[in-house]
Amino acid sequence: MKQLFRQWYDLSEIKKELTTRNWFPATSGNISIKVSHEPLTFLITASGKDKTKTTPDDFLLVDHLGVPVLETELRPSAETILHTHIYNNTNAGCVLHVHTTDNNVITNLYSDAVTLQNQEIIKALDIWEEDATIHIPIIENHAHIPTLGENFRKHIQGDSGAVLIRNHGITVWGRDSFDAKKRLEAYEFLFQFHIKLLSIQGGVSNGANSYS
C-alpha cells in the first residue's frame, strides 16, 4: 500500500508539472506509472478528466490488461492499450503521452519517421556519441484502438523509447518517472528547435521534407 501511495504522489507531481506547460489541452493525453511488477499493476489517468485539476479521482489502478483492479466508476484512458503493451514487453516504469502543437506539426512534415541529429540535448536520451542521430517512428492514428495498439507495439524495442502518432501526440516511456519526463522534455525541445529552424530556412516550400 505504501508503494501505491508513493507512486500516486509521483504521478500527480508529474501531471502538475506537465499541466503548467499546457501539454494536456482539452483533457487530452494520459500518463501512467508502474506500481508492481508481479503481478503487473500500474496507475493511469482516468478518462475525460480536466488535468489542470487535482482530485482523488485523477488515477485508477489497472492490471496487465488495463482492467481496473478495484471496483470503480472511473474509466481508464482510451489509449491504455499503449501503456499495457509497453509494460508487458519492457521493464519501463513510467509512460507519458502528451499532445503538443510541435509534436503534431512534426508528424505532418514527415512520413514514417523523423530524423534529428547533432544536438547536445540528445545526450538526455542516453546517447553519448558526438553528432548523434536519432530516429523517432511515426505511425498512423487509427480510430480502431486495437489496430493502433498493434502498430504501436511493433516499435517497442527497449525499456525506454518514443513513438509519434500522426496528429495524436507522442508517447514516451522510461525506466522511471524521472527518466520518462527527461526524455519527453528532450524530444519536445528537439521538435521545437527543428520547426523553428525550418521556419528560418524557409520551411517546406524551400526544400525541407514534407508529408501530406
Curated annotation (Swiss-Prot):
Gene Ontology MF terms in the entry: methylthioribulose 1-phosphate dehydratase activity; zinc ion binding
Pathway it works in: Amino-acid biosynthesis; L-methionine biosynthesis via salvage pathway; L-methionine from S-methyl-5-thio-alpha-D-ribose 1-phosphate: step 2/6
Enzyme Commission identifier(s): 4.2.1.109
Cofactor(s) named in the record: Zn(2+)
Catalytic activity: 5-(methylsulfanyl)-D-ribulose 1-phosphate = 5-methylsulfanyl-2,3-dioxopentyl phosphate + H2O
Principal EC category: lyase
The organism's place on the tree of life at top rank: Bacteria
Coiled-coil ranges (or none): none
A Gene Ontology term for the protein's cellular component: cytoplasm
Entry's cofactor comment: Binds 1 zinc ion per subunit.
GO biological process: L-methionine salvage from methylthioadenosine
Residues the entry annotates as binding Zn(2+): H97, H99
Alphabetically ordered keywords of this record: Amino-acid biosynthesis, Lyase, Metal-binding, Methionine biosynthesis, Zinc
Subunit relationships: Homotetramer.
Job description of the protein: Catalyzes the dehydration of methylthioribulose-1-phosphate (MTRu-1-P) into 2,3-diketo-5-methylthiopentyl-1-phosphate (DK-MTP-1-P).
Similarity comment: Belongs to the aldolase class II family. MtnB subfamily.
Annotated protein name in UniProt: Methylthioribulose-1-phosphate dehydratase
Organism: Bacillus cereus (strain AH187)
Gene from which the chain derives: mtnB
